[in-house]
Amino acid sequence: MYSIKCDDNKVMPRERLMRLGAESLSNQELLAILLRTGNKEKHVLELSSYLLSHLDSLADFKKMSLQELQHLAGIGKVKAIEIKAMIELVSRILATDKTLTDSVLTSVQVAEKIMAALGDKKQEHLVVLYLDNQNRIFEEKTIFIGTVRRSLAEPREILYYACKNMATSLIVIHNHPSGNIEPSSNDYCFTEKIKRSCEDLGIICLDHIIVSYKDYYSFREKSTLF
């Protein structure tokens, strides 16, 4: 098995990282550091290059199962688990780094922040952002995971947290795992229902946003409901 240390003709990724910083490394080199060793056929840099060449984008890593990663990269289960764990950790770091504490200005700002967290989920998630009277998000609450159709029919829990936290307004977001962001008839019905229910309680429903891993649909921007 080829190690990351075996190439004497160039400065290897670890040494480049120590000398120049992680930001100076290519995707191939960063992945090689995570892989550490190659397989029987390929040096670790060749293996990382091969793996990247079979992906449309780095985001595809999040969508791959352990079995798919093992098969494509020709690596063992332990190494595949380590890579998946690192990918999840990076995802959580990004989500933390993009904590929604600033004032909300546009739907696209919200969508870009939430897409990183929800875009690759295999199940549908319904998330609500609760805002104060200065349009600052003070809480992000996952209301439901699983069959969003069932959740979309019942806004009671959404409004419970709004009243409990004395929210002035809220934004509803859910993902479409299929990647198709076009709203269904059920999405339209739910949006009308939650908007009416919010108005009855003096709470403003600012938007209902549907996200995928690369795009979003804003009812405020594209529908006549707002």
Swiss-Prot record:
Where can the motif JAMM motif be found? 174-187
Q: Which PROSITE patterns match?
A: MPN, UPF0758
- Keywords for the protein's UniProt record, in alphabetical order: Hydrolase, Metal-binding, Metalloprotease, Protease, Zinc
What GO molecular-function term can you cite, just one?
metal ion binding
- Is the keyword Magnesium assigned to this protein? no
Q: What positions does the entry give for Zn(2+) binding?
A: 174, 176, 187
- One GO biological process term: proteolysis
> What's one Pfam family the UniProt record gives for this protein?
RadC
SUPFAM superfamilies noted in UniProt: RuvA domain 2-like
Could you tell me which residue ranges the MPN domain spans? 103-225
Question: Which family is annotated?
Answer: Belongs to the UPF0758 family.
Protein name, as recorded: UPF0758 protein SpyM3_0777
Naturally occurring in which organism (per UniProt):
Streptococcus pyogenes serotype M3 (strain ATCC BAA-595 / MGAS315)
